[in-house]
Amino acid sequence: MLKDYTTVVVGTDGSELAVPTVTRAAWIATKEDADLVIVCAYGGGSRRADAKVPLTETAPSRIGQVPGKEAATLAVTHAKDIAVAAGARVKATLLVEADPAEALLSSSKQHLGDLIVIGAIRDRSIAGRLLGDVASVVVKRAHCDVLVIRPVNPDEGDQICPESDA
């Protein structure tokens, strides 16, 4: 017998690729009558740098990580709007200054999540191929079920590449 989900945790970076992930997490939370926890990982960034980079054009230095707290706030606000419109009960929106996988894993444990919903964005950089992408790390280390949402267009997730120092 399958157990019901009581707390669904979803990661967002505010990108268009995150919309189907948040939408699916909200749908599951609504169907399961579960709480929804929205998590956004961010890296240190100045207010000036945040202001110069539109959320839709962000190419974070780490896949899935938003550059700065202000951009992360916009990302979780957008995700919450999507979730509420879908009928989900949002228990918390979290801004976590950490690696995206670690942010999801620790937030899920802290909020007693029994399902993590994450998007499948692949990091094509050398480091990404050696270390694995965020979804791979979460799937390997999660204490609960993990649902990986594929992009609607299969090529979309391949086009994400972190900035280089060049």
Where are these predicted regions, by residue range?
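Short, solvent-exposed amphipathic alpha-helices that sit
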Residues: 24, 70-79, 103
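Short secondary-structure boundary segments
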Residues: 40, 119-121, 150-151
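Structural beta-alpha unit
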Residues: 1-4, 78-116, 153-166
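Small/aliphatic-rich secondary-structure junction motif
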Residues: 2-61, 88-93, 165-166
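A short acidic, glycine-rich active-site loop
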Residues: 58-74
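Short, flexible loop segments at boundaries between secondary-structure elements
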Residues: 144-156
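Glycine-rich, Arg-bearing micro-motifs that act as flexible, cationic patches
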Residues: 115-137, 155-159
